[in-house]
Amino acid sequence: MTLLSSISKIGTIKNGNSLNEITSTISNNEAKGSPSFSGNQSTKSIGDLLLQIAIITKATTKNK
């Protein structure tokens, strides 16, 4: 299971922000590193996803 597919299974975090923005469908080809995307899959870059994860992580740790 990849990091992004693990994150997509998380519902919401303590401060109520939804993780819907950073979830994406990862096909087997994408998980293996293939650069091809079909029309219905997210085309957000990995950098964008990592940035959003970092922002959410910072927000959740600040609330503890």
UniProtKB/Swiss-Prot annotation:
It comes from Dictyostelium discoideum (Social amoeba). This is Protein sigN173.
